Design a protein with these regions (language model features):
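VWA/integrin I-like adhesion module and closely mimicked acidic/polar interface patches used
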Residues: 7, 11, 62-70, 75, ...
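Beta-strand-rich structural segments
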Residues: 302-317, 327-329
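Von Willebrand factor
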Residues: 1-47, 77-80, 94-99, 137-139
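C-terminal "exit" segments of structured domains
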Residues: 162-259, 265-271, 276-286
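Short, solvent-exposed loop/linker segments at the N-terminal edge
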Residues: 206-208, 297-303
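Short, compositionally biased P/S/T/A/G/V-rich stretches that sit at domain boundaries
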Residues: 282-300, 310
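A short beta-turn/strand-edge loop motif at beta-sheet boundaries
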Residues: 89, 210, 222-223, 313-326
Length: 341
């Protein structure tokens, strides 16, 4: 309920939809938990299926900020923890909280008080921390009244992060910091410009063959329809029909997801509404695993050991030297009995 004032432009909805579209298309699931005077969960949906992503975004579009002011943060966080408890134990698990940071319980709500909700916030934080679930908080501050201290505490207690945002442009960097921890992603700023009604051409480079997905994120205050993409061979890509491209757009953003993009220089042309400020980012993730081969089965302190370390992608050893440039690493050996390192 309090989001009616803090998020008049429905930034939370646009940001959550952008996150859904940016999420990788393999080995990932997303659940939506909506909380007001009651909690509604979509359950975990596999993001490898486009229809599931569309379903999640339809649910988000249907969210209404209605009076009276109900924001039961504690109940929402407890439900989010419960949803993650039932997910695949092998995957990294995170909670992303979109909120104005205010917990509001209407005075007429039976058997529920603000104190109850705040106690549940603390319980959820403790459970998340114990289970290794990081909580990332996005504080929506359109009315300047965000409870930053609450968000800082939630994030710090679970080894997460928080971000205060007034515009969707504030969020791709923050999203990338999340993806960097769970999806091995990197971000590049391609360009930003004020639209003049003509096409604005930009270039970006895919510099190695192990990029699994590349997300071109176009942020604007008005919806963009005219986008042209050209691959390194100079061929224009049909962004609506090409099987290696997924195109999504909404009120505040457009997103092109390129699957296993070709190495080389790409170009993109964007035509926006005159006067609109447009920002274009590239966020990409790798399909890479680290393989360590050790000759010795017994390690003796003070004795030399031989080991080989490789990067693998799609089951094959990576030989692309560009990926190995500027890499460094360290090895820790620990005695299982004494715990000495």
């Amino acid at each position: 309920g309090s989001m009616r004032k803090a998020d008049k432009e429905r930034l939370a909805i646009e940001a959550a939809k952008l996150f859904v579209d940016m999420e990788k298309t393999s080995n990932a699931s997303i659940a939506l938990v909506e909380f007001s005077n009651k909690v509604v969960s979509s359950g975990l949906l596999d993001t490898s299926q486009q229809e599931n992503k569309n379903q999640l975004k339809e649910v988000l579009d249907g969210v209404r900020y209605s009076a009276p002011a109900h924001t039961d943060t504690g109940a929402g966080l407890l439900e989010a923890v419960s949803v993650l408890d039932g997910s695949d134990v092998r995957n990294e698990k995170v909670i992303i909280l979109f909120t104005d940071g205010k917990t509001d319980i209407d005075a007429g709500t039976p058997n529920r008080t603000i104190e109850d909700s705040l106690n549940d916030v603390n319980t959820a934080i403790q459970e998340a921390a114990q289970k290794g679930y990081k909580i990332y908080c996005i504080g929506l501050n359109a009315d300047g009244k965000v409870d930053e201290e609450m968000l800082r505490n939630i994030a710090a207690s679970t080894d997460g992060q928080y971000k205060i945002a007034t515009d969707v442009n504030d969020l791709p960097d923050f999203f990338n910091s999340i993806f960097a921890q769970i999806d091995k992603s990197e971000k590049q700023n391609i360009d930003e410009f004020d639209a003049d009604g003509n096409y604005h051409e930009m270039h970006f480079t895919i510099d190695n063959s192990s990029v699994m997905e590349a997300n071109i994120v176009i942020l604007s205050s008005m919806q963009i329809e005219d986008i042209c993409l050209t691959d390194p061979s100079g061929t224009e890509v049909d962004i609506q029909e090409n099987a290696r491209v997924e195109f999504n757009n909404s009120a505040k953003y457009s997103l092109l997801k390129l699957f296993t993009p070709d190495v080389g220089e790409w170009s993109i042309k964007v035509k926006g509404v005159t006067g609109d400020h447009i920002k274009v980012n590239l966020i990409y993730n790798y399909d890479i695993d680290l393989i360590v081969e050790v000759e010795n089965t017994v390690v003796v302190k003070g004795k030399k050991i031989n080991l080989q370390v490789y990067l693998y992608s799609r089951g094959e050893k990576i030989t692309d030297k560009a990926i190995y440039q500027n890499m460094s690493g360290y090895l820790t050996i620990q005695n299982k009995n004494s715990q000495e390192q």
